[in-house]
């Protein structure tokens, strides 16, 4: 695998420069939003996951498949559409897909597949998911309302506002559980990669890590409203709602660990794959050419966007002279 490192480094640097706006925007969200602070841990986690597979990768050599670079054309088209409509998340996801394509083109099918889990984990670098916040608010509000009905607590719901005799609660965007959901899914994917070897078990556990935090957030919101009813004051119950949230998140993570632990698969019996040692190792020129092919075809999208912007600017009417 070591011969591929220079080509990957050059390719990643070139793509980083090409998509620098996406990188800057992503890091800005990591810093400003608590829902995405965990993104700073993604690259160290990926590095550890690759290191954890060192026994399987013994003797692994890259066999580039340069022709897969053609997939950069439709991905670039997706990036272009996202750029035209102003969806930064779409641009970032397309850019990350190009990065995945770079790894595939340089490493080859077998080596890429051996590293598929860690490499796909790189998608957590993209701060996506904000678009589901209204849906999460709907789910949390409905869960809380039905829970109050079951508990016999009088309530009136208008959109995301829940009124009880003791006061009013509002299911704000921050209360929808997005940050808990994203963090739980990131943890669930990491746990699945470390504890399971079969893709079936990994997929099941990841699905569980999506469902459990959504339900848990509903219980959290219901608990806060019910506590306000018991205390006789909505303000008193909502005072420490952030603390309650982190306690619930800790419980969710513990619950996921407990649910997944009995089904873990032993990782100690992993052996190095047969890497066809008799095949010739690809030259540095071949590896760099594969990376260059991905870069050149991916560059068509940003280049087209720049040309469109220049043409649009040229069509704008000139400002009248100042008097």
Mark where each language-model region is.
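Hydrophobic N-terminal alpha-helices or hydrophobic patches in metabolic proteins across all domains
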Residues: 1-323
């Amino acid at each position: 695998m070591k011969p591929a490192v220079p080509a990957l480094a050059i390719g990643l640097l070139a793509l980083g420069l090409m998509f620098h706006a996406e990188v800057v925007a992503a890091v800005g969200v990591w810093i400003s939003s608590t829902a995405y602070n965990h993104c700073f841990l993604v690259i160290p986690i990926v590095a550890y996951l690759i290191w954890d597979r060192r026994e399987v990768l013994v003797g692994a050599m890259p066999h580039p498949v340069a022709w897969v670079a053609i997939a950069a054309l439709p991905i670039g088209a997706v990036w272009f559409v996202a750029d035209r409509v102003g969806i930064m998340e779409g641009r970032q996801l397309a850019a990350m897909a190009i990065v995945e394509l770079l790894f595939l083109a340089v490493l080859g099918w077998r080596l890429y597949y051996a590293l598929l889990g860690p490499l796909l984990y790189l998608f957590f670098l993209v701060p996506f998911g904000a678009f589901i916040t209204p849906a999460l608010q709907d789910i949390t509000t409905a869960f809380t309302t039905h829970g109050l009905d079951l508990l016999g607590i009088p309530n009136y719901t208008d959109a995301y506002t829940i009124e009880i005799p003791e006061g009013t609660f509002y299911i704000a965007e921050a209360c929808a559980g997005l940050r808990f959901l994203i963090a739980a899914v990131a943890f669930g994917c990491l746990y699945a990669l470390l504890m399971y070897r079969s893709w079936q078990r990994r997929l099941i556990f990841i699905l569980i890590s999506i469902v459990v935090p959504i339900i848990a957030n509903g219980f959290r919101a219901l608990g806060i409203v019910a506590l306000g009813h018991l205390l006789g004051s909505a303000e008193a119950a909502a005072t420490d709602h952030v603390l309650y949230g982190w306690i619930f998140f800790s419980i969710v993570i513990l619950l996921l660990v407990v649910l997944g632990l009995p089904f873990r698969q032993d990782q100690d019996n992993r052996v190095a794959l047969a890497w066809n040692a008799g095949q010739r190792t690809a030259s540095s020129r071949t590896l760099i050419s594969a990376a260059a092919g991905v870069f050149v075809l991916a560059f068509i999208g940003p280049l087209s966007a720049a040309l469109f912007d220049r043409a649009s600017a040229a069509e704008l009417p000139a400002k009248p002279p100042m008097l």
